Amino acid sequence: KYGVELHAWMWTTNRVEKHLRDAHPEWYQVNAQGESCNDIKLYNREHYRWLCPSRPETTEYLKDRVRELAEIDGLTGIHLDFIRYPDVILPYGLHESRGVVQDKVYPLWDFCYCEKCREEFKKLHGIDPMDLEDPTACQEWMQYRWDVMAKMASDVAAVIKECGKVSSAAVFASPEESKKLVRQDWANFKNLDYVFPMIYHKFYDKDDPWVETATREGVEALAAADNPAL
């Protein structure tokens, strides 16, 4: 009657359900210190528990959640949020309030170094990322994480489309900041009808005009990626 659409909001890699954490602790991401985010509270946030995108079973779990949501009567679409890694670096305007110093990438917040990620990367490049002298300087290791997250996002979004629903995702502010801060290469997320960049400029210590700058960067990145979905 009023043109209102119903879209389900789905937390994607960020899954806090106790039954899931207890049943499959191996699904959760591990930092460069060997600590699982299932066991530690990142940024003192209880909900910061993140599934690893390298594991096929985590993607299948998320696909099943999509199929469940798609059964909701009157549902128009499904919106993927938290389709990323934990913040390796928080947006700059939040450092003081969260009590962190992040002048570089620190092992505590650098994910994922679980057995599956290490195994798959070694198959591709012949080295365990744990053995890299400086993982942050290894372009192949960065690209691996961007790619596996993009594949998970694309595969989950494909199921949304198969269910006949509109697919969308919340993404970080600009493509480069997103890749740097949360390992999210959203310009290469396929099968999405819409992306909604979270251009919270004050989080980045930016003035209002940066909203336009970040928007333009996003449009240009999508064009450069030749992403047919958007």
Cite the ranges covered by each PLM segment:
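Generic structural signal for hydrophobic
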Residues: 1, 62, 69-70, 189, ...
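Aromatic-lined substrate-binding rim segments of carbohydrate-active enzymes
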Residues: 1-18, 24-29, 140-164
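Active-site-adjacent "subsite" loops/lids of carbohydrate-active enzymes
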Residues: 5-73
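Conserved, mostly hydrophobic/aromatic
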Residues: 6, 62, 69, 78-81, ...
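Active-site beta-loop-alpha junctions enriched in small/polar residues
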Residues: 11-15, 82-85, 172-176, 200-202
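Aromatic- and acidic-residue-enriched segments that line the glycan-binding/catalytic groove
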Residues: 14-44, 83-130, 187
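A structural motif
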Residues: 74-75, 192
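Glycoside hydrolase catalytic-domain groove-lining segments
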Residues: 108-230
